């Protein structure tokens, strides 16, 4: 299976770690995920506490120096290496089981119908 680069820009978001763990735990092919994280926070997440830390490319920026989500996302793009797919998410999300396989299956189906590469976009539901 191909690699998915998951881009996460975060500004002082207490749900960042929960989001990363949800994406990882609910993926069918965990080994194919690479996370690019730009955290704009006064205290970053403890990467040593994350068992998949070797799959995270991480930068911590002082929130005083923050220049918004577009700036953080541009920093994250420098973390991309040879991954096949790019998924940009918010830092406060919960993932469904098998989300990675579902997205790739959907992309393959779109390509079969249209013979062009596509972009899937959406706005996630809120949660409590």
Regions found by a protein language model. Name each.
Residues 1-128:
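Catalytic cores of eukaryotic secretory-pathway lumenal/extracellular enzymes that build
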